[in-house]
Amino acid sequence: MSRAILIVLDSFGIGATADAQRFGDAGANTLLHIAEACAAGACDSQGRTGPLRLPNLNRLGLGRAGEASCGAAAPGLEQAPEIIGTYGFAEELSSGKDTPSGHWEIAGVPVLFDWGYFTDKQQSFPPELLDAIIKEARLPGVLGNVHASGTQIIKDLGMEHRATGKPIFYTSADSVVQIACHEETFGLQRLYELCQITRKHIDPYNIARVIARPFVGASPEGFRRTGARRDFATPPHKPTLLDKLNNHGKQVIAIGKISDIYAGKGVSRSVKADGLGALVEATLTVMNETDEAAAKQDTLIFTNLVDFDMLYGHRRDVTGYAKALEDFDAMLPDLLGAMMDDDLLILTADHGCDPTWPGSDHTREHIPILMYGKRAPHGFIGARKTFADIGQTLAEYFQLDRLDFGESFLVADK
């Protein structure tokens, strides 16, 4: 039987797409700009120094994929090691640069319509929408109602929130409503219930996600977001690869926020973990648990590594992003070592979030495709026209019918 491990390095783009100008992202390049900053000494800290060092990702072809994407070699990744897998890059067919669009397209369902957005920087949400939420959730009111950085807004409004019980509502350039509440004074379960109420009321606005942003602490300097974040996404508009796997008796194990992104659709089992190390460890645990089970049931293990995006991309923390990449690279041999002979491993991303770029939003970029396994073609698979090529490849690997979008790059079974 077959087993595949699909890991999304959330926001790890490798070069602006041809249509990036339309998003204000022409020239963005998450990988290249991090590598350039490291080479210039701008990322030297107590935790790391010198050029960006990603030897294991580079052996899978990351450096070559990055250079093929943008025409420039990332400093520290120029040396051409012996490539042990498949490498390439893909552009996005979907209309946006958000998490659901990227993940759904990876699973064969690009978002070809436009999401709804709250574009006003101040007084961002329609009064009638907030009034309906306040009434149903029995709130004393709301705070925020702006475009904001999630870490900054809890510093600015966290004390007032604790004193009044008014939740903090904010948004961004993404199709999203984010709600920040104190875990202890407001309550975590109450925050989740508020997000479910909000999800219902924003459906007519075609908004992709409501995100619960719990935090703790007693002062602006001490406030910090916790790992109890939850995403309340609208379900995919068509069956994804996950649904098709489930419908054919195959197992989909979602690790991290994957289940939330697909609104639970097509997920056999969800495993929650918080932090890069914990998410990789959870992936390894599931790989070890399914060693024997995989002989009886085809299994897709699907992990999202959110820290790259949430902690470093949006916060424009170049040093933190570089160190996290190096930390993941050091964990990669454990993942490769846990693979069975016929396993397939795919590493990719869902969009960019260049930490050197102005603002705090995602960037429209190519994503890397790095693949390892017996049926992975050796070397360069070129520029792919859609993220859905990943889903189509997995559909072929699991012997499913063709998906509506994408072209497989799998080699024939030997």
Curated annotation (Swiss-Prot):
- Could you tell me one molecular function GO term of this UniProt entry? phosphopentomutase activity
- A Gene Ontology cellular-component term: cytosol
- Chief localization: cytoplasm
Instruction: State the free-text cofactor note.
Output: Binds 2 manganese ions.
Q: Which InterPro entries match?
A: Alkaline_phosphatase_core_sf, DeoB, Metalloenzyme, Phosphopentomutase_DeoB_cap_sf
**Looking at the keywords, is Repeat present?**
no
- Biological process annotations from GO: 2-deoxyribose 1-phosphate catabolic process; 5-phosphoribose 1-diphosphate biosynthetic process; metabolic compound salvage; nucleotide metabolic process
Segments passing through the bilayer: none
Cofactor list:
Mn(2+)
Catalytic function, reaction form:
2-deoxy-alpha-D-ribose 1-phosphate = 2-deoxy-D-ribose 5-phosphate; alpha-D-ribose 1-phosphate = D-ribose 5-phosphate
- Keyword list, A-Z: Cytoplasm, Isomerase, Manganese, Metal-binding
Pathway(s) annotated for this protein in UniProt: Carbohydrate degradation; 2-deoxy-D-ribose 1-phosphate degradation; D-glyceraldehyde 3-phosphate and acetaldehyde from 2-deoxy-alpha-D-ribose 1-phosphate: step 1/2
Subcellular location, in the record's words? Cytoplasm
Record EC number:
5.4.2.7
Q: Which CDD domains does the record match to this protein?
A: PPM
| Residues that coordinate or bind Mn(2+) 2 | D309, H314, H362
Please, which domain of life does this record's source organism belong to?
Bacteria
Q: What does this protein do?
A: Isomerase that catalyzes the conversion of deoxy-ribose 1-phosphate (dRib-1-P) and ribose 1-phosphate (Rib-1-P) to deoxy-ribose 5-phosphate (dRib-5-P) and ribose 5-phosphate (Rib-5-P), respectively.
Q: Which NCBIfam families match?
A: deoB, PRK05362.1
**Family as reported in the entry's similarity comment:** Belongs to the phosphopentomutase family.
The name on file for this protein is: Phosphopentomutase
